[in-house]
């Protein structure tokens, strides 16, 4: 298995040719499968992919870890550059996610255009699901561990 970071928050001194954006996108390649885990906040991962020998058009499936813009809004670009792969994410009735601190409020949720214009390729799951042979999405993450302190500033529209 090979995991390639297509985009994240940090610039590599050894790779000034790679663009940086807030967010994350990983390409995971196995002997039989090409997958994306998250797609960053925009199309930057698509710009970086050819520089890292990754063909977005050949990706078999994609997974969105959660509905914050810096992990999922690049999916709009993904469906433009890849005509076949499904994009999997956890079902949620919540549509709007916000960050609020020090008098500022910012929408940090999924772009509603993605939910409307995904050509039927957005697949919602609500339980542990095998999405490819031996590849599972786990939707129920336990609360056994303390959440990051920054989460105190995150909420959904229905919470406030």
Each predicted region: which residue ranges?
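Short acidic low-complexity segments
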Residues: 55-58, 122-131
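Hydrophobic alpha-helical segments and helix pairs
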Residues: 72, 77-78, 84-126
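Hydrophobic/aromatic beta-strand patches that form the interior of the parallel beta-sheet core
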Residues: 4, 63, 88, 123, ...
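Beta-strand-turn-beta hairpins that frame and shape the catalytic cleft
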Residues: 1, 30-34, 129-137
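Active-site metal-binding loops of divalent metal-dependent hydrolases
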Residues: 8-10, 39-42, 67, 92-93, ...
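Conserved beta-strand hairpin/beta-sheet module of binuclear metal-dependent hydrolase folds
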Residues: 2-51, 159-160
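Active-site-proximal loop/helix segment associated with metal-binding centers of metalloenzymes
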Residues: 99-105, 109, 115, 127-160
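Active-site metal-binding motif and surrounding structural segment of the metallo-beta-lactamase
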Residues: 44-89, 93-94
């Amino acid at each position: 298995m090979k995991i390639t970071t297509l985009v994240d928050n940090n610039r590599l001194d050894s790779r000034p040719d790679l663009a940086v954006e807030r967010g994350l996108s990983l390409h995971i390649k196995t002997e039989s499968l090409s997958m994306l885990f998250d797609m960053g906040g925009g199309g930057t991962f698509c710009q970086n992919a050819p520089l890292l020998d990754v063909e977005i058009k050949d990706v078999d499936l994609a997974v969105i870890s959660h509905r914050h813009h810096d992990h999922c809004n690049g999916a709009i670009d993904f469906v433009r550059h890849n005509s076949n792969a499904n994009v999997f994410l956890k079902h949620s009735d919540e549509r709007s996610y916000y960050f609020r601190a020090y008098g500022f409020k910012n929408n940090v949720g999924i772009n509603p255009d993605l939910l409307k214009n995904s050509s039927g390729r957005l697949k919602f799951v609500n339980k542990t699901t095998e999405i490819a042979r031996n590849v599972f999405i786990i939707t129920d993450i336990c609360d056994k561990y303390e959440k990051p302190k920054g989460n105190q500033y995150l909420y959904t529209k229905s919470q406030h």
